[in-house]
């Protein structure tokens, strides 16, 4: 490769100048010679035409064509090698005589508008040259300046045109080009001979030296460059030979050193083998210690949590018995201490998982606003108990449908807000959620938690995110905790691709903020209620806390309401309002029933009064509703709570659902599928009043067989059924030719965001949450009735939820509403629930006895569904909690307190139901 490159460079350096110079000289001489030939031809033509013009002056004066014709013919024959034609034109530009009638004389004639030449003119056209000169009488001198055109025309007798042939010039040019090319090729050949000789004298020795260097590279250190060389090549030869001699000496010395090093290495290897054996033993001991540590943590999770759950469970059971105040106080202390210890154990286990890298984040679709609303609602109790106002402000540009780990996000919020509650004695705890960055597939959100607590001194801020450390050692004694909460929070935020920081001033409060990255979910998970009915309505809003008021006003600004805000009720402009939202301060501790005059005045000023109550005031909700309050909302107010309450005003003003008569039944054939007899009976009873034909199936197999026999306008499908679940049944039904377009509605009590998307992706047209309410079902039937034009999924509009006391054992009004106001149906549903309780009790008692029976989660799910239609909210919530824990992987033995509480609640339900059923 090197030889070829050198050869090519030498050839280029030799040939390029030769070719370039020869080419330039050839072009110069050819062009110069061509111009000389043309000039010679032009001079020859001039020597012919100018004497001819003088000679023809006399003949033109006499108009003697014959004499002039003979003259030009003689000249044409004498110069026939270059002359093609000679033509004479008179003073009127007419052909007078020509020497060659075979050529078109008009090519030599001047144009009609071209003046006669006053002297010799030359024109060229391709291989033709035309010379023209005037014929002037002897009385005219060219040096004179004629005073008029008339005088010129009198002295101008005509002109002579001579046409010359340039082909001979072209031929001579080609001949000289050919000679130039031959000479240039000859020079190139001579240059090639010299270049070849030079390359042989240079590349030959170089090739010899390259071969010698290659032999030296292969280890033949005795190789030398031989032969006679000139100049620098001889110097290079001597250098290579000297290098080979040096390499040979170095190689000999190196070999000696290698032998010595090999001997030393053998001794070192023997020592390393001994050390490796010791390291291997130490590694095995370390692995065994790590294994024992992992087993210890796993055992601690079970051995500590199980007895703690037992302590908590039996403490709760004991608290339900008759106790003295001292005993109740002691038991409450035991329960709080056990819960604190359980929280510490959970923190330690989470920290261990994070340290080991075994904590895996989920990636599921979820509604961001509902998720944050849920965790803030849980934290509101402890915040309001301390008299702290808790607010949640989610900016309107923050996307709601996202994909991530909602439980870990809630854990982060819980840790940060829990710390804020712990270290704040009065004031506010404000949560602000903003969009930081947005792309087509991802969103980065920033969450700020601001409190008015004790703050953190600057000297203690550096160790805030260290494990088992707190800013002040006395904090753990006063407030409890392990110092792991912020460490776990920081690691969770980092796992979500974000970071966390804070700013704090002693005695002024702290602000913690973090940002995380979430994927955008293109599908709609939850749509809010329609607020168009609020257009043109006036709302009076009273809230003494400015931060809480601002958050609520931001929500109201997204509605068409006209809002009148006042920080106090007394400052509210006296007028009549369509709606009024009255916020009660969290520091207000008097019973609201004592504010009778104030509430009565508020009721008189509006058609629909809503109260925003702190948690400790919720006990008065039922009594307040009896006094004319339209809705009692739990603080902090969020869109998921406030907007449905506002739209309830529309239903308060007009009844959108008219009683269904036999004549108003929808012309539909609907099939309902549910393995729970109570659920199936209720759905069937509701459908009988709304549609003309109803088919009931208690299994997925039966539903598929019935779908083969007849077409349906709509199918209500339970999801969790034995043998064949609702998703599989939906797939098989849609495979039937006459059922391909039949809408299948998923009926589920687990309307979690991720499951909703899974159901819609599996072929379900829509979903209906349990417990089924009459108004929801009727709206669904209206949208999917034949001819309604609904061909794609439509999100079920929100129906206002009734106020339910979650701690009520039996709410007969709720049971009646769930049974569409039918007393007999409500009694039947309650009786079916009581008949099912013994089976559940046996299974739960087997679990508590350590027998680990199969099918517990399915039985709890079935009980959960039955509770949804029987007006037993407390037992329904217990079933939901137990089922969620079991499906999330929690072991049955870890749920011992909840199962004991469920057994106790079964007894309470049976006792309360006996009073109604007799």
Swiss-Prot record:
Q: What is its EC number?
A: 2.7.13.3
Question: What PTMs does it carry?
Answer: Activation requires a sequential transfer of a phosphate group from a His in the primary transmitter domain, to an Asp in the receiver domain and to a His in the secondary transmitter domain.
Protein's UniProt name = Signal transduction histidine-protein kinase BarA
Q: What class of enzyme is it?
A: transferase
Location comes to:
Cell inner membrane
| A molecular function (GO) term | ATP binding
| Entry keyword Nucleotide-binding | yes
Phosphohistidine-modified residues are 302, 861
Where does the sequence pass through the membrane?
11-31, 176-196
Record topology, Cytoplasmic segments: 1-10, 197-918
- The segment(s) forming the Response regulatory domain are 669-785
Q: Can you give the residue ranges of the Histidine kinase domain?
A: 299-520
Q: List the disulfide bonds.
A: none
Family annotation (SMART domains): HAMP (SM00304), HATPase_c (SM00387), HisKA (SM00388), HPT (SM00073), REC (SM00448)
Q: Pfam families in the record, alphabetically?
A: HAMP, HATPase_c, HisKA, Hpt, Response_reg, sCache_4
List the InterPro entries hit by this protein, alphabetically: CheY-like_superfamily, HAMP_dom, HATPase_C_sf, His_kinase_dom, HisK_dim/P_dom, HisK_dim/P_sf, Histidine_kinase_BarA_N, HPT_dom_sf
Reaction(s) catalysed by this chain, per the record, are: ATP + protein L-histidine = ADP + protein N-phospho-L-histidine
Q: Name one GO cellular component term.
A: plasma membrane
Bilayer disposition of the protein: Multi-pass membrane protein
Residue intervals of the HAMP domain: 200-252
Secretion signal span: none
């Amino acid at each position: 490769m090197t030889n070829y490159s050198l050869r090519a460079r030498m050839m280029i350096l030799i040939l390029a100048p030769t070719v370039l110079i020869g080419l330039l000289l050839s072009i110069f001489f050819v062009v110069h010679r061509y111009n000389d030939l043309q000039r010679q031809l032009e001079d020859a033509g001039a020597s012919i035409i100018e004497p001819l013009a003088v000679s023809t002056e006399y003949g033109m004066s006499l108009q003697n064509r014959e004499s002039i014709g003979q003259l030009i013919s003689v000249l044409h024959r004498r110069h026939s090698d270059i002359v093609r034609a000679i033509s004479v034109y008179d003073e009127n530009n007419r052909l007078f005589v020509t020497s060659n009638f075979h050529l078109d004389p008009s090519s030599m004639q001047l144009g009609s508008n071209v003046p006669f030449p006053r002297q010799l003119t030359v024109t060229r056209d391709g291989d033709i040259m035309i010379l023209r000169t005037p014929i002037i009488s002897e009385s005219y001198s060219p040096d004179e300046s004629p005073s008029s055109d008339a005088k010129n025309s009198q002295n101008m007798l005509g002109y002579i045109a001579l046409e010359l042939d340039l082909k001979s010039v072209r031929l001579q040019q080609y001949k000289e080009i050919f000679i130039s090319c031959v000479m240039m090729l000859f020079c190139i050949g001579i240059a090639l001979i010299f270049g070849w000789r030079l390359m042989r004298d240079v590349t030959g020795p170089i090739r010899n030296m390259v071969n010698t260097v290659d032999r030296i590279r292969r280890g033949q250190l005795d190789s030398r460059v031989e032969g006679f060389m000139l100049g620098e090549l001889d110097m290079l030869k001597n250098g290579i030979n000297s290098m080979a001699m040096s390499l040979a000496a170095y190689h000999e010395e190196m070999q000696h050193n290698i032998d010595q090093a090999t001997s030393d290495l053998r001794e070192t290897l023997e020592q390393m083998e001994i050390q490796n054996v010791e390291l291997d033993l130490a590694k095995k001991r370390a692995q065994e210690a790590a294994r024992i540590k992992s087993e210890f943590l796993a055992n601690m999770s079970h051995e500590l949590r199980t007895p703690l759950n037992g302590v908590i469970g039996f403490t709760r059971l004991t608290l339900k018995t008759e106790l003295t105040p001292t005993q109740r106080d002691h038991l409450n202390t035991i329960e709080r201490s056990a819960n604190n210890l359980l929280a510490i154990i959970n923190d330690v286990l989470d920290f261990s998982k994070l340290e080991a890298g075994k904590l895996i984040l989920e990636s599921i679709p979820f509604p961001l606003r509902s998720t944050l609303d849920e965790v803030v609602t849980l934290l509101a109790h402890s915040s309001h108990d301390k008299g702290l106002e808790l607010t949640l402000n989610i900016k309107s540009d923050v996307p709601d449908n996202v994909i991530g780990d909602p439980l870990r996000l809630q854990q982060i919020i819980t840790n940060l807000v829990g710390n804020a509650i712990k270290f704040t004695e009065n004031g506010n705890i404000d949560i602000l959620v903003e969009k930081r960055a947005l792309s087509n597939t991802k969103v980065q959100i920033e969450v700020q938690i601001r409190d008015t607590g004790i703050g953190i001194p600057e000297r203690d801020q550096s160790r805030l995110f260290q494990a088992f450390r707190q800013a002040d050692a006395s904090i753990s004694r006063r407030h409890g905790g392990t110092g792991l909460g912020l460490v776990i929070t920081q690691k969770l935020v980092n796992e979500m691709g974000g970071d966390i920081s804070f700013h704090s001033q002693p005695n002024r409060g702290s602000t913690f903020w973090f940002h995380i990255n979430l994927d955008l979910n293109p599908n709609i998970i939850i749509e809010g209620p329609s607020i168009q009915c609020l257009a043109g309505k006036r709302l009076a809003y009273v809230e003494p806390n400015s931060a809480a008021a601002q958050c609520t006003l931001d929500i109201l600004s997204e509605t068409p309401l006209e809002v009148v805000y006042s920080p106090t009720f007394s400052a509210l402009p006296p007028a009549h309002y369509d709606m009024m939202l009255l916020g009660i301060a969290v520091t207000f501790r008097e019973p609201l029933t004592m504010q009778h005059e104030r509430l009565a005045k508020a009721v008189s000023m509006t058609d629909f009064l809503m109260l925003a109550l702190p948690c400790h005031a919720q006990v008065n909700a039922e009594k307040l509703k009896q006094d004319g309050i339209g809705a009692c909302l739990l603080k902090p107010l969020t869109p998921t709570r406030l907007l449905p309450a506002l739209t309830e005003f529309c239903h308060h003003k007009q009844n959108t659902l008219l009683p269904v008569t036999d004549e108003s039944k929808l012309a539909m054939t609907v099939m309902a599928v549910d393995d729970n007899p109570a659920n199936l009976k209720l759905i069937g009873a509701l459908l009988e009043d709304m549609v003309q034909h109803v088919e009931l199936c208690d299994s997925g197999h039966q539903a598929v067989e019935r779908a083969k026999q007849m077409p349906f306008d709509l199918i209500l499908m339970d999801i969790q059924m034995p043998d064949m679940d609702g998703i599989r049944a939906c797939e098989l039904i849609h495979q039937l030719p006459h059922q391909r377009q039949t809408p299948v509605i998923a009926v589920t009590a687990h309307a979690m965001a991720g499951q909703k998307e899974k159901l819609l992706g599996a072929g379900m047209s829509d979903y209906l949450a349990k417990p089924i309410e009459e108004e929801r079902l009727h709206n669904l039937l209206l949208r999917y009735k034949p001819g309604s034009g609904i061909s794609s999924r439509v999100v079920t509009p929100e129906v206002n939820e009734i106020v339910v006391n979650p701690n009520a054992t039996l709410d007969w009004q709720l049971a009646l509403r769930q049974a569409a106001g039918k007393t007999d149906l409500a009694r039947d549903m309650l009786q079916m629930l009581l008949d099912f309780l013994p089976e559940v009790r046996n299974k739960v008692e087997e679990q508590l006895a350590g027998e680990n029976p199969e099918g517990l989660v399915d039985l709890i799910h079935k009980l959960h569904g039955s509770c949804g239609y029987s007006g037993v909210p407390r037992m329904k919530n217990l079933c939901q909690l137990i089922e969620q824990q079991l499906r999330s992987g929690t072991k049955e033995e870890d749920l011992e307190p909840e199962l004991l509480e469920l057994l106790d609640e079964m007894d309470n339900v049976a006792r309360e139901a006996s009073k109604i059923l007799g």
